[in-house]
A protein has these predicted regions:
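Charged, low-complexity surface patches
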Residues: 12, 32-33, 64
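A glycine-/small-polar-enriched, mobile loop at the entrance of the PLP active site in fold-type I
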Residues: 24-34, 81-83
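Glycine-rich flavin
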Residues: 38-46, 51-126
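Generic N-terminal amphipathic, Lys/Arg-enriched alpha-helix
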Residues: 2-6, 19-26
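A short, structure-level motif marking secondary-structure boundaries and short turns
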Residues: 12, 24-27, 56-57
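A short alpha-helix capping/helix-coil boundary motif
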Residues: 17-21, 49-51
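N-terminal, positively charged, Ser/Thr/Ala/Gly-biased leader segments
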Residues: 7, 12-15
């Protein structure tokens, strides 16, 4: 689902504000399903929300951290869980700037929907 044609050409905060109504509309489904619904993920990827902190070489915005925080805030107003998911992926995205460029490109550069996050699962969750 594309929110606006060529939305990825807009500034990250403008893209976040454009997709925020879709995030808000999905909030009950997110809570009930304990996951981001596929149609919302499509919208977030279409707006390149997960790529805000990625280096340009990997197809990201290479935004300042202050700008990324504004993106998270715009999404969090719509649904805090969605902002949390984006924030989790942001830590890995920032790491791309410190990796060998070829390695970072292999992870994020080939697929515009590539997202990486890590963390420990709750006991018994797997």
């Amino acid at each position: 689902m594309r929110v606006v044609q060529d939305l990825t050409m807009a500034a990250p905060l403008a893209r976040a504000r454009a997709v925020a109504p879709l995030v808000a509309a999905a909030a009950d489904r997110i809570e009930a399903g304990r996951e981001l619904p596929a149609d919302l993920l499509d919208a977030l990827h279409g707006a390149a929300i997960f790529r805000t902190l990625l280096p340009h070489a990997c197809g990201g915005d290479e935004a300042r951290l202050s700008e990324h925080v504004q993106v998270l805030e715009a999404i969090a107003v719509a649904d805090a869980s969605t902002a949390w998911c984006i924030g989790q992926a942001a830590g890995c995205s920032m790491a791309a700037a410190y990796m060998a460029p070829a390695a970072a490109y292999r992870v994020w550069g080939r697929d515009p929907r590539a997202v990486l996050a890590w963390g420990q699962a709750a006991p018994g969750a797997l």
